Structure formats: structure tokens, C-alpha cells
A protein has these predicted regions:
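Elongated alpha-helical scaffolds
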Residues: 51-72, 358-361, 367-368
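A short, polar beta-strand/turn micro-motif
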Residues: 71-86, 373-380, 385-390, 611-630
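Beta-sheet repeat architectures centered on beta-propellers
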Residues: 1-9, 413-734
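Beta-propeller and closely related beta-pinwheel folds
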Residues: 269-301, 307-454, 462-466, 470-498, ...
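Conserved beta-strand element within WD40/beta-propeller blades
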Residues: 15-18, 65, 304-305, 358-361, ...
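Long, charge-dense tracts
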Residues: 53-55, 62, 68, 82-91, ...
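N-terminal beta-propeller domains
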Residues: 1-32, 188-347, 410-426, 657-662, ...
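Short linear interaction motifs
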Residues: 37-54, 270-294, 340-349, 589-594, ...
């Protein structure tokens, strides 16, 4: 399943799920919206691996859906060819001058004007009169032709087949002008033509790249496209659209210019515009034709496409136009089609806007596209930036001033942090997983993050029930002050399909044995539940009001979902001070119900699944300064850890397991119930801050120290200190 989140505005947010040949849309409250599929539209999303082969991007009410395996093509229907035709334009009339039209080698029209010996002969030299006389001859001498005169213009069309033609006059070619097939200059065109008549303007004789076509539209000569060409896209092979329609539902359709009706109002679907001017030389097909589209993105008010070794941008402001609007001149808003120049084959997989630039990813290299103030064919260039291998299963994600992308490390995976060094202005990509190379399992298929919450999530195909979490904190100069990797591990039967982030919430799509769920996780630190001074920590947490049965003296809570794991009931913030935040002793009555003795039906309670928190300390070492900014661990000698102190804040419960090598584990528990504390009330949760001290008495490499908690109460740790005895039998000589 391919998952995509649409964040239209604060009031409208939708989760899109694309299956093999099907598409569904839900609100974040779980309400399914109606999706109307245009005829044949779902053929585009027929694929056995939607997760890998589909990609989506949303702008306003339109979500572009691309199938990375679909080869784009042109429509096989060519435009209608014009019949063989010509226009004869009587440009000048002079006394005693002969005007001739020759067709297929035979003179079919001949007229000689009178001399100027008589003033009445002036009517003989008018251009309209000459055209009339020539037309009379044409009508007398030709059959199988359509002949129309309009003033000094004569239009001739052969009803079937082709013909050759030439003209003669006594004025050196300046009296009778022929327009057939092509003409040298736009200035040679008559003041008017025949509606639909088309001709090629050849321009310079040494090149075909300045040729263009014009036709008479009934009022003026306008630029047009050569007839008989395949100018349109095969819309069934182009990116499709998921449109949020005026009634609040959705329509999935190719961008084919079709129309649909809602109520009594008709709406038009956008259309990938075909070639409207020029020919295959002056206005060639975009380079994505005949290949697959790997990525689609927005940059500088253009819709960009990565295909093969090219990046193609639409006409500025026209996301469905990939042809020139005129071939007579170059315009700043023209489409742009540019290819790589590299000594390796560089198939472009992704385009990511980055610090006003565009970062382009191939399998082994990264390229920077940085135009001037405007993106035009004249100003654009692509330069190689770095060479890092990437895993193209997951699209890189930009967070703040960094871009994160995955790479393979044998049967494991890593994530690089791409940035511009503030010291050297060089582009670098540090390995965030260098100190734990075997932590993330292979094949990262999704990377999502939040710059506001300084967090990145990585999803792996090898561990579908895990969320790998990278947390980071940078100073004002983009220096990393803190970094960490951790993971959220769900039930072994859970399959995480994807996640997306809106503001401070991560929305997770999870497939379970009983269906697909959309669940959300609050990423904001120090959040508390209503009327509580902490957030109740339960998985799949929901607020439920219990039902009390006086006959059995039991309160029953019914979950909105089935659950077989151990669940808890915690009284919410609407309860009195002595009750709120308390966890009840409950009976797991069924997979959807919990019961507790007593009446707890007056206010809602939080119901959810218990989960385990675990943090294992790395080994403690003595460290010595190597440079002004770095330290190194000292492995020589013996370090005997005597004790440690854990500094915590706003914490209600945790346990610490200390396991010396070859000895049993000792557990030390903190419950928040501290005698003499002003917040201590028996049976009521209490959040405390302070230092928790515990003995170690073990060699640093022979002990494992783990913090854990399965409570609904929070635990927050600020730092840890240890002290011990370090002895060394050798001495370093310098």
C-alpha cells in the first residue's frame, strides 16, 4: 500500500491509501470519503508493489500520482493533414502586364492588363480585377479543384491528391505571389488568407531550427503546429490526478481535459497540453517520453520531472505544459529540459528543493541545479556536488537546512545527513549511524520528519513493526549539539505501512490482523493531558466513559478496537485530585472490554495498551582530549565503576537493572513516592525531580545498565554521572 497525507488546511486533512488498482481516502477522524474513478483511471495504479512504485505530491486541490513503472507515450492519433492547397495573391497591378498560373506544368490561367492609353483602362489593373480574371480561367480549365476568390486572394485546393504550381508575372515576381507549402518570410504573407490555410515560414536557408508554421484563423495569421504530427500525450501513461472536488469528495482521473458535473455545475479536469506550435525539430517532445518518470516535484513555480538522465520543468505557472508556446523566440517562462553531464550513468531518482537550490539524486551521485534569479533555459545549469550512494527505496526528506537520505550497508542500512558546511561552504553528508552500523535493518522504504520537533523517522522493510527514530539538536551555526537513534517497537504482528507528520503529530498507518488503523503520536515535548500535570503514556490511548452495573459492582469500558495485549485504565483529568491519573486494577474481560470493581462511570478514563520503555547505557570509559574540540576513549588500564547518579525531572516511575558479568540482575526502582515530599499523597501519582543514586561495583566493560519502565507515568532523564577508580600499569612516553 502507498500512503500519502493531504494537508489542505487546518480544517481539511486526508489520508490517501493507494492499493494495487484501487485508491481510498479517509479523513484523519477515519471517515472514508467517496472517490469517483474516471473510466480506466485505476489501470494506471495497477501494480504489485504500490509502496515502492508509486509517488505522490499535492498542491492545492490536486494530488499528482505517478507510477514509476509506467512508460510515458504519445497518443498514436496524428493531427489531420491539410489538403494540397495554395493561395495566389495579386500584390501589384501594372499596365500591359501578363499574370500566369501554371499547375502541374500546364498554364491554367493567363491575364494581360490593358495599356494606359485610355483613362478607362485603369480598372483593368486593379488587383481585384486581375484576381477575378485569373479565377475565371481557373474555373474554366480545372476540374477536381475547389477555387475561392476573396478580393485579390485566390484559394485553390485539389479535392484529391497533390499538385505542383508556379506563377509568372512581368514585374519580377512582385506582382503575383504564390503561397504553397512554405515561404521565406512572414512579411511575404498577404494581408489576409483563407480560413484554415497553413504554410511554413522557412527563415534562414541554412537551418531548420528557425522554421515555424502559421495559419489564417479568419482574422489574422497566427502561429500553429505542423499538420499530420502526433502532438498529444497518451494521458493514460502520464501522471494522474486525485482531485478534491467541490462537494468535499474526490475524483481520480487522468489529466485529459475531461469534464464532470457536481450538482448542476460542470468542472474541467486539467489537461496535459500537447504541442501547439512548430514541429518535431523546433518543438521536440519532452525527454520523459518513451521512459519512466522517477520523481515529480515543484520548484520555482514549475512542475519538475526526473526521468532517465534528464530533469524537465513545465512552463512557469502552467504545470501541465511541457512544450514551447512559440518557436519564433525564446521566452523566460518556456519549459526547460536539461540532461546530466557526468562520466557515470546517472539516472535521476529524486529532486529535492534545498536552500534555494535543487538537489538531484542518482544512485551514486548528487547534483546541484542552481539558476539565477529566474529559472530559464539560458540560466540553468547542473553541477556535480557529491558522490554518495543512496537507497532509492525511500525518497530523501528535507528538514530545516539539511536533507536526509538512506543507504545500504550490507544487510543493514544507514542514514546520511546532507548539509553545507558553515566553515568551508562545502557540501557534506555525514553518516548519522556510524556509531551503530548494525542498528537499522536493510531496505529503508520511507523517511519522514519534522524540523519543528527535530525528529526523523525511518521505516525498514526488514522490520515492519519498528519505527527507527533519529533525534537531533543544532545550534544557530548548524553545529550538532545532540544526536541519538532509538526505536519504537510495536507488536510483532503489526505492519507499519507508512507515516506522515502534520505540525506536532505523526500519523501512522498500521496494518493489524483485524484491519488497517490510522493512529497519531504527539511529538511535542512536555505535553500534558487536560487537568493533569503529565501525559498518560499508553499505546493506542483513547478516552472512554465506563458503564457501571450496580448488580455486579463492576464498571465496564468498551474499546473502539479489539486488543489482546495487556491494557490499562487510567482515570482522566475530570476526576477529583485524589483520583485523577490513577491506574486501576482491571480485569481483561474480552478483547474489547475491561472491567474494574467499583463505580468509575462518572467521568471518562484513558484506556490503552501498556508498553515498555528501555534505555541501555553504553560502556563507561575514561576520555582524554585529543584536540581542542574532540576527545577519545582510553582503553588501557582498568576502570572500576563504584556508583552512578541519574538526574531526572518530572518523573513518576522507572526501574534500573544492573547486570554484572556472570551474575544475577539487580533491580532498583523509583516510584515517585518520596517521604517528606510536598507532593506525596498515598495512592496518587506524583511527579518528582532529583537524583537517583545506585551502586555499581563492577569493571566498566563487565556491567550492563538498563533503565526501563512499563508505567503510564512519564520518565525524563537529564544526565547521568559515575565515579570509579582508574588504574594503569603502563606509562605513555612521548
Amino acid at each position: 500500500v502507498k500512503s500519502h497525507l493531504i494537508n489542505r488546511d487546518e480544517a481539511e486533512q486526508y489520508q490517501v491509501l493507494i492499493y494495487n488498482g484501487n485508491i481510498k481516502v479517509y479523513t484523519l477522524a477515519g471517515v472514508e470519503k467517496t472517490v469517483v474513478n474516471a473510466t480506466g483511471a485505476t489501470n494506471y495504479i495497477t501494480n504489485a508493489n504500490p509502496e515502492k512504485n508509486f509517488s505522490c505530491i499535492t498542491v492545492a486541490d490536486y494530488t499528482f500520482v505517478i507510477n514509476k513503472t509506467k512508460v510515458t507515450a504519445k497518443d498514436t492519433t496524428a493531427s489531420a493533414s491539410r489538403p494540397d492547397e495554395a493561395i495566389y495573391y495579386v500584390k501589384n497591378g501594372q499596365y500591359r502586364t501578363t499574370y500566369k498560373i501554371i499547375i502541374d506544368g500546364t498554364e491554367v490561367a493567363n491575364f494581360q492588363t490593358l495599356d494606359n492609353s485610355n483613362a478607362s483602362n485603369a480598372s483593368s489593373i486593379t488587383t481585384d480585377n486581375i484576381a477575378t480574371e485569373l479565377t475565371n480561367d481557373l474555373n474554366s480549365n480545372l476540374s477536381g479543384y475547389t477555387i475561392v476568390r476573396d478580393g485579390s486572394i485566390i484559394y485553390v485546393k485539389k479535392d484529391s491528391g497533390t499538385f505542383t504550381s508556379s506563377v509568372e508575372d512581368g514585374l519580377g515576381g512582385d506582382g503575383l505571389i504564390q503561397l504553397k507549402d512554405k515561404i521565406g518570410s512572414f512579411s511575404d504573407l498577404p494581408y489576409k488568407g483563407y480560413t484554415g490555410f497553413q504554410i511554413e515560414i522557412t527563415g534562414d536557408k541554412g537551418t531548420e531550427f528557425d522554421n515555424y508554421f502559421v495559419r489564417w484563423d479568419g482574422n489574422a495569421w497566427v502561429e500553429t503546429v505542423k499538420d499530420g504530427l502526433k502532438n498529444d500525450f497518451d494521458k493514460s501513461t502520464m501522471p494522474h490526478l486525485l482531485i478534491r472536488t467541490a462537494d468535499g469528495n474526490f475524483r481520480f482521473t487522468p489529466a485529459d481535459g475531461s469534464s464532470y458535473t457536481i450538482g448542476s455545475t460542470s468542472y474541467d479536469v486539467p489537461n496535459f497540453k500537447g504541442r501547439t506550435v512548430g514541429d518535431e525539430t523546433t518543438n521536440p517532445d519532452p525527454s520523459f517520453i518513451g521512459t519512466t518518470i522517477n520523481d515529480i516535484f515543484f520548484y520555482r513555480n514549475r512542475l519538475g520531472i526526473c526521468a532517465d538522465e534528464n530533469v524537465i520543468f513545465s512552463k512557469a505557472g502552467e504545470f501541465f505544459n511541457y512544450y514551447f508556446s512559440t518557436v519564433t523566440t525564446t521566452q523566460d517562462d518556456d519549459m526547460v529540459d536539461i540532461s546530466m553531464s557526468h562520466n557515470k550513468v546517472s539516472i535521476l531518482k529524486f529532486g529535492i528543493p534545498f536552500n534555494e537550490e535543487l538537489l538531484l539524486f542518482s544512485d551514486q551521485s548528487q547534483f546541484i541545479l542552481k539558476p539565477e534569479e529566474t529559472l530559464t533555459a539560458k540560466t540553468v545549469s547542473i553541477n556535480q556536488a557529491t558522490e554518495y550512494e543512496i537507497d532509492d527505496s525511500a525518497k530523501p526528506v528535507g528538514l530545516g537546512q539539511n536533507i536526509y537520505f538512506g543507504f545500504k550497508r550490507g544487510t543493514f542500512a544507514g542514514v546520511r545527513e546532507y548539509f553545507i558546511s558553515s566553515d568551508s561552504e562545502m557540501k557534506e553528508a555525514t553518516d548519522t549511524t556510524i556509531n551503530l552500523p548494525r542498528y537499522i535493518t536493510s531496505d529503508i522504504f520511507s523517511l519522514k520528519g519534522s524540523a519543528a520537533e527535530n525528529v526523523l523517522f525511518a521505516l525498514s522493510n526488514a522490520d515492519r513493526n519498528k519505527l527507527f527514530v533519529y533525534k537531533f539538536y543544532f545550534d544557530a551555526n548548524q553545529k550538532a549539539l545532540q544526536r541519538s537513534w532509538s526505536s519504537f517497537i510495536f507488536e510483532s504482528t503489526d505492519v507499519i505501512l507508512d507515516l506522515d507528520i502534520i505540525q506536532n503529530f505523526a500519523y501512522i498507518v498500521i496494518k493489524r490482523s483485524d484491519g488497517v488503523y490510522l493512529e497519531k503520536m504527539n511529538l511535542k515535548a512536555n505535553e500534558v493531558d487536560t487537568n493533569l500535570d503529565f501525559s498518560v503514556l499508553l499505546d493506542r490511548k483513547t478516552s472512554v466513559t465506563g458503564v457501571y452495573n450496580s448488580g455486579t459492582n463492576l464498571t465496564t469500558w468498551t474499546l473502539p478496537y479489539p486488543e489482546t495485549a495487556t491494557r490499562s485504565v487510567v482515570l482522566g483529568g475530570n476526576w477529583s485530585t485524589n483520583f485523577r491519573g490513577r491506574s486501576l486494577q482491571v480485569n481483561q474481560a474480552s478483547n474489547t472490554t475491561l472491567t474494574a470493581t467499583g463505580d468509575y462511570s462518572s467521568n471518562p478514563a484513558f484506556v490503552g495498551r501498556n508498553f515498555n520503555f528501555k534505555y541501555e547505557f553504553s560502556k563507561f570509559y575514561v576520555r582524554e582530549a585529543k584536540t581542542a574540540t574532540s576527545k577519545a576513549s582510553v582503553n588501557l588500564g582498568r576502570l572500576q565503576i563504584k556508583k552512578m547518579a541519574l538526574v531526572f525531572g518530572d518523573t513518576g516511575f522507572f526501574e534500573i537493572d544492573i547486570t554484572p558479568l556472570a551474575r544475577t540482575t539487580g533491580t532498583h526502582k523509583f516510584t515517585g513516592q518520596i517521604l517528606g515530599s510536598s507532593g506525596f499523597i498515598l495512592g496518587v501519582p506524583n511527579m518528582e525531580s532529583g537524583t537517583f543514586k545506585l551502586p555499581i561495583q563492577c569493571k566498566n566493560t563487565d556491567v550492563t545498565i538498563v533503565i526501563k519502565s512499563d508505567s503510564h507515568l512519564p520518565c525524563n532523564f537529564l544526565s547521568a554521572e559515575w565515579n570509579g577508580i582508574y588504574s594503569i600499569l603502563s606509562q605513555r612516553l612521548t
